[in-house]
């Protein structure tokens, strides 16, 4: 079933190829572009202003792509990334793959070297379609100037349909040509609602379950399905867990909210889902990293019947055995299952289940509030030594508790990849979706700052706060030179400052006998000082009270138009390693001798 909307007049018009391009963007309401200016895109960027499109010129294209990701995730509205052919475009690779695994519909515009010189190894020439083949859900190159609008329309529609980035590749000599074309029609398809037989079986399993658990993934947020899942959970008195890095997939204040699974997530959620006899995995691909053991608990319920709901059939049953697979929109499926439940659904052990949920949540809340420090594995002493070296400094958990005391409930937050941000995974909760912008399963460093800038562009009246470790922040620090200009909105960003690549250092303590290779950062660098040099406000916080006060003031300043970077000085404690499942202690066999090193001979 399909429906049409926003159709242009069905008659040919004479226009330039760049006008056709921009008119198609207008048809789809794409109002924001992120990147760095280049000659190959100037014919279209020249008319952005007339079209109502704002071009946000960042300091590095990779950060620009992550700004686009943050904007679209926070608003639900598509944006685009665009830059100069060749090196400008290849700088987008990490951002595009990040958006792919964040299920973010984005338009990637890649101006190409001119057709007449392609294949000659010319200036800024690279095979851009090949570069992004595994990064996008759909890609197409314009083969003739008269097809400019047709191809662009199709690329945008596929980005929306598959909820992922899609690429249009345009030879630069196709711009500034006059063509006669009809603007294309927009044809949107209704999202699938699931097969009747599968829905009946899912409703039957949930109706008979003694300990049903719902697991909400990104698809719940994208489909606007949180209210529908709340109704279903309340009907069953089923606890609701959230997928890894999707803390905003269910209201934190709801009595059935069990918190996020995965790395440094909610122990309550892990303990509750381990008891499940039926799991409704709603809008999630159940990626393996998100269900790894945590806190020593191998919590995934191996004997439970799994109902997996995803709009992409190829992802159902890919990582976990399922009893029922449903290809459908999370909101539609949740509503239909609710309507199909039996009259006695949820009654089995209802009161006992409610008591277990409340008791488990309460115990975890008390434990989390008392956690001040990180633990060492047997045989290692790094965290003990780190506390002894700086006894007056905050630990990462102390910093997160100080942050929680000042963080507005309505705030949008972004998080970077890394040890200190990951330790904070259990802390933030939200009352609505599109509030938590984590880097996702591609795991890029340098995501936190650009993502929160993009979110603020899309949600100017909402407070935003970004978080990064100091290693990851170093990858995006050059954006401080861009975001202080008058047209850019004010944001607040917190950098956890412990002068180390913490996640890799924890690996070094556990498996490499404290042989720290490439883990130490320069203690002479002041990120707060760099912020000040860029015309922004830079603040250093050394205690919990200072951090709470600094964040509270920064949010007030943000409302008044001032961007603040807070350097939160913390000790060098290290949290749980990311990849305990993938690491093991190496054993020397042949041995390595420095005397075997030879000098290279240069002609």
Curated annotation (Swiss-Prot):
Alphabetical UniProt keywords: Acyltransferase, Magnesium, Metal-binding, Thiamine pyrophosphate, Transferase
One record GO biological process: L-valine biosynthetic process
SUPFAM superfamilies associated with the record: DHS-like NAD/FAD-binding domain, Thiamin diphosphate-binding fold (THDP-binding)
UniProt GO MF annotations: acetolactate synthase activity; flavin adenine dinucleotide binding; magnesium ion binding; sulfoacetaldehyde acetyltransferase activity; thiamine pyrophosphate binding
InterPro entries documented for this protein: DHS-like_NAD/FAD-binding_dom, Sulphoacetald_Actrfrase, THDP-binding, Thiamin_PyroP_enz_cen_dom, Thiamin_PyroP_enz_TPP-bd_dom, TPP-bd_CS, TPP_enz, TPP_enzyme_TPP-bd
Gene3D superfamilies xref list: 3.40.50.970, TPP-binding domain
Keyword Acyltransferase: yes
GO cellular component: acetolactate synthase complex
Domain of life per record: Bacteria
Required cofactor(s): Mg(2+); thiamine diphosphate
Enzyme Commission number(s) of this protein: 2.3.3.15
PANTHER family, per database record: ACETOLACTATE SYNTHASE CATALYTIC SUBUNIT, MITOCHONDRIAL (PTHR18968:SF13), THIAMINE PYROPHOSPHATE ENZYMES (PTHR18968)
Function description: Catalyzes the degradation of sulfoacetaldehyde into sulfite and acetyl phosphate. Involved in sulfolactate degradation.
Listed name of the protein: Sulfoacetaldehyde acetyltransferase
């Amino acid at each position: 079933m399909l429906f049409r909307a926003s159709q242009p007049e069905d008659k040919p018009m004479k226009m330039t190829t760049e006008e056709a391009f921009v008119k198609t963007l207008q048809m789809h309401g794409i109002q924001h572009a992120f990147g760095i200016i280049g000659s190959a895109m100037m014919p279209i960027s020249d008319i952005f202003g007339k079209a109502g499109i704002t071009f946000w010129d960042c300091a590095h294209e990779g950060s620009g792509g992550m700004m686009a990701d943050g904007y679209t995730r926070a608003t639900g509205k598509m944006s685009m990334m665009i830059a100069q052919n060749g090196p400008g475009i290849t700088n987008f690779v990490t951002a595009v793959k990040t958006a792919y695994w964040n299920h973010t519909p984005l338009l990637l515009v890649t101006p190409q070297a001119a057709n007449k010189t392609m294949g000659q190894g010319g200036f800024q020439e690279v095979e851009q379609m090949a570069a992004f083949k595994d990064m996008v859900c759909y890609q197409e190159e314009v083969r003739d100037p008269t097809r400019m609008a047709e191809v662009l329309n199709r690329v945008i529609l596929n980005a929306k349909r598959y909820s992922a980035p899609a690429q249009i590749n345009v030879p630069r000599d196709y711009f500034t040509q006059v063509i006669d074309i009809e603007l294309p029609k927009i044809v949107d398809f209704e999202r699938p609602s699931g097969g009747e037989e599968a829905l009946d079986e899912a409703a039957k399993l949930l109706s008979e379950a003694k300990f049903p658990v719902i697991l909400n993934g990104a698809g719940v947020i994208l489909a606007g399905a949180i209210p529908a899942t709340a109704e279903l959970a309340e009907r069953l008195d089923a606890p609701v867990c959230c997928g890894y890095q999707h803390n905003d997939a269910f209201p934190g204040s709801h009595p059935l909210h069990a918190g996020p699974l995965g790395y440094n997530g909610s122990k309550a959620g892990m303990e509750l889902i381990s008891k499940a006899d039926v799991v409704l995995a709603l809008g999630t691909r159940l990626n393996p990293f998100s269900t790894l053991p945590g806190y020593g608990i191998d919590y995934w319920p191996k004997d439970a019947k799994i109902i997996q709901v995803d709009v992409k059939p190829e992802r159902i049953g890919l990582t976990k055995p399922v009893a029922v697979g449903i290809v459908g929109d999370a909101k539609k499926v949740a509503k239909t299952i609710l309507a199909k439940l039996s009259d006695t659904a949820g009654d089995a052990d209802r009161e006992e289940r409610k008591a277990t949920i409340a008791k488990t949540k309460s115990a975890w809340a008390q434990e989390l509030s008392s956690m001040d420090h990180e633990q060492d594995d047997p045989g290692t002493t790094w965290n003990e030594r780190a506390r002894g070296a700086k006894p007056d400094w905050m630990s990462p958990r102390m910093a997160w508790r100080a942050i929680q005391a000042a963080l507005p409930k309505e705030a949008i937050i972004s998080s970077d990849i890394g040890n200190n941000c990951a330790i904070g995974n259990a802390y933030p909760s939200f009352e609505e979706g599109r509030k938590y912008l984590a880097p996702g399963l591609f795991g890029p460093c340098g995501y936190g700052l650009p993502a929160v800038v993009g979110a603020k562009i899309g949600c100017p009246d909402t407070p935003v706060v970004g978080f990064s470790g100091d290693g990851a922040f170093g990858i995006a620090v050059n954006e401080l030179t861009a975001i202080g200009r008058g047209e850019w909105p004010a944001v607040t960003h917190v950098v956890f400052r412990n002068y180390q690549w913490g996640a890799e250092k924890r690996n070094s303590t556990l498996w490499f006998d404290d042989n720290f290779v490439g883990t130490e950062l320069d203690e002479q660098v002041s990120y707060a000082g760099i912020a000040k040099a860029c015309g922004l406000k830079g603040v250093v916080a050394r205690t919990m009270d200072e951090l709470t006060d600094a964040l509270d003031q920064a949010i007030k300043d943000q409302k008044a138009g001032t961007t603040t970077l807070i350097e939160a000085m913390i000790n060098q404690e290290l949290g749980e390693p990311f990849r305990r499942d993938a690491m093991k202690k190496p054993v020397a066999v042949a041995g390595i001798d420095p005397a075997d090193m030879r000098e290279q001979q240069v002609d």
